[in-house]
């Protein structure tokens, strides 16, 4: 009996320590912790902010296009995308004709934003003209530009 009393007392003591040690502290000081990037105030005058905005616009365009499968090249077209500092597009991108109106608006917005970025930060480029594709072919359900 004395032995079981010691076992139960030890078990109760260990349980109490476990419960109190795992409890979260509500009064923790979070001022020294790093701020999540989404919670940080946007510094709209910084180059990094503008680069991130360009990347976001480009990824929106690419993800919208990636939703569509290429089964017939006649259902696809291509457009110039981006703006080199000394003129001309950065690249060409294939897009499905069925979303032509919305995607061309996004591509034009991206190109205009890149042109403004180039002027704002005095960006220089290689000034090489990018060859315009001669067509599109479907490969693995993805549109591939033909040069």
Task: List where the protein language model places each region.
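Short, low-complexity, Pro/Ser/Thr/Gly-rich segments in the mature regions of secreted, periplasmic
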Residues: 135-146
